[in-house]
Curated annotation (Swiss-Prot):
Keyword Disulfide bond: no
Recorded superkingdom: Viruses
GO-annotated molecular function: DNA-binding transcription factor activity; RNA binding
UniProt subunit comment: Homomultimer; when bound to the RRE. Multimeric assembly is essential for activity and may involve XPO1. Binds to human KPNB1, XPO1, TNPO1, RANBP5 and IPO7. Interacts with the viral Integrase. Interacts with human KHDRBS1. Interacts with human NAP1; this interaction decreases Rev multimerization and stimulates its activity. Interacts with human DEAD-box helicases DDX3 and DDX24; these interactions may serve for viral RNA export to the cytoplasm and packaging, respectively.
GO cellular component: host cell cytoplasm; host cell nucleolus
Protein's organism: Human immunodeficiency virus type 1 group M subtype G (isolate 92NG083)
Bias (Low complexity): 93-105
Residues modified as Phosphoserine: S5, S92
Pfam families listed in its UniProt record: REV
Gene expressing this chain: rev
UniProt keyword terms in alphabetical order: AIDS, Host cytoplasm, Host nucleus, Host-virus interaction, Methylation, mRNA transport, Phosphoprotein, RNA-binding, Transport
Protein name: Protein Rev
Short motif (Nuclear export signal and binding to XPO1): ranges: 73-84
Length: 123
């Protein structure tokens, strides 16, 4: 691993210099030429930028010894969640035991589903 030999700060600075050189090696395309030529140059430039971004992530993860992105936050299952739009702050449409409050950790469960559309027959 790159961060284990020598000074870790020096290795990180070296990785940052490499990444900076990569980005500087891909300047934005010139505005000359026809519309289609400019569009093609920008498309190829964006593809190179994506490649440089992925290479940079790999360099940093190798240098730091961990992924560059944080671990995603675990969310509760969506099946048990509902929106409580009551204005009075009550528990309209939910069943709760006496003395408990609904918060982020306790999803609200609807007792009966709301009617969104009618039966489809015109009266």
């Amino acid at each position: 691993m790159a961060g284990r030999s020598g000074d870790p700060d020096e290795e990180l600075l070296r990785a940052v210099r490499i990444i900076k050189t990569l980005y500087q090696s891909n300047p934005y395309p010139s505005p000359a030429g026809t519309r289609q030529a400019r569009k093609n140059r920008r498309r190829r430039w964006r593809a190179r930028q994506r490649q440089i971004h992925s290479i940079s992530e790999r360099i940093l993860s190798a240098c730091l010894g961990r992924p560059a992105e944080p671990v995603p936050f675990q969310l509760p299952p969506l099946e048990g969640l509902s929106l409580d739009c009551s204005k009075d702050g009550g528990t309209s449409g939910t069943q709760q035991p006496q003395g408990t409050e609904t918060g982020v950790g306790r999803p609200q469960v609807l007792v009966e589903p709301p009617v969104v559309l009618g039966s489809g027959t015109k009266e």
